[in-house]
Amino acid sequence: MGIVSKQSIQNTLITYVGFSFGAVNALFLYTHFLGETYYGLTAFLLSSGGILMPLMAFGAHNTIIKYFPLFKTEQEKSGFLTFMLFFPLILILPLLVLFFFFYTDIALYLSRENPIIYDFFWMLPILGLLMGYFEVFYAWVKVHFQSVFGGFIKEILIRVMIMISLYSVHIHWLTSVQFVFLLVVIYGLSTVLMMISAFWIRKPIAKIFIPKEFKAIFVYSAFIILSGSVAAMLIDIDRFMISQFVKIENVAYYSVAVFIAAVVAVPSRAMHQITHPITARLMANNQHDELNMLYKQTSI
């Protein structure tokens, strides 16, 4: 069994198991243990973090997959990956400055329909940053064709931690407010685990490395931000917009419907985790026959 078939099957199983946990959370635990208001708030925060993620990552997760095959020596590969750890700071730092200086204005604007959002607005850039760097570290392992553990963290572990937290609300170990704050801890822990996995596979180097393709990398990442932001908005902008026009409880109802519809995309989502880096490598090496074969195999 080839690496595509093997990891696609593993990722598909992981994704379906993760969706099973997600179904229990979305259809039962959120609605019964957390309540409509805080379920809607949670969906708003996670959707907003998902919208910010491409900006916070500055397209680095896709840039890593595209450009990694171009570096031939182990030193160059390690240097490139280390460089990409700091590359997103080009956009992160200006964004954080804007959040700092215009915090009150932005928070008041976003919470005009649902005042509850104001007290939790500080979580948005943090969640976006954590989600962004999770994807950077996930891309780090994908280019080494080891996508399964990252899929486990993303699809199963996060949902299990949320499930445990929701049950803690039910037995009064946590309040609903504490649960919402705990989202930062859950996504922070997931990002740290992904970082450990990435560094276990290939350690960063303590040396400044500026790739000669810097200009091309910068331009590509800028375009990826546009496409990535559009893709993220198509997935998450609806829940964000609902919170701006109607009561936040409606975000909870809508999230249940969206989750049910998302099950259809599971096989494609799982296969993409391994086919994306393989496609990038074949294109970088001009292996068009192998690329043609890969397209045929994955379209079946």
Predicted regions, residues:
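Alpha-helical transmembrane segments of multi-pass membrane proteins
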Residues: 51, 97, 112-134, 184, ...
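Helix-loop junctions and terminal segments of transmembrane helices
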Residues: 57-72, 143, 257, 262-299
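Short membrane-interface helical motifs at transmembrane helix boundaries
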Residues: 28-31, 94-113
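Interfacial transmembrane-helix starts/ends
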Residues: 5, 43, 75-89, 218, ...
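Membrane-interface helix-loop junctions in multi-pass transport and translocation proteins
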Residues: 31-39, 144-149, 160-192
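Membrane-interface junctions at transmembrane-helix termini in multi-pass inner-membrane proteins
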Residues: 5, 130-153
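Interhelical loop/hinge segments that connect adjacent transmembrane helices in multipass membrane
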Residues: 1-4, 116, 172-182, 192-235, ...
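Signature of the first transmembrane helix
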Residues: 3-62, 100, 127, 163, ...
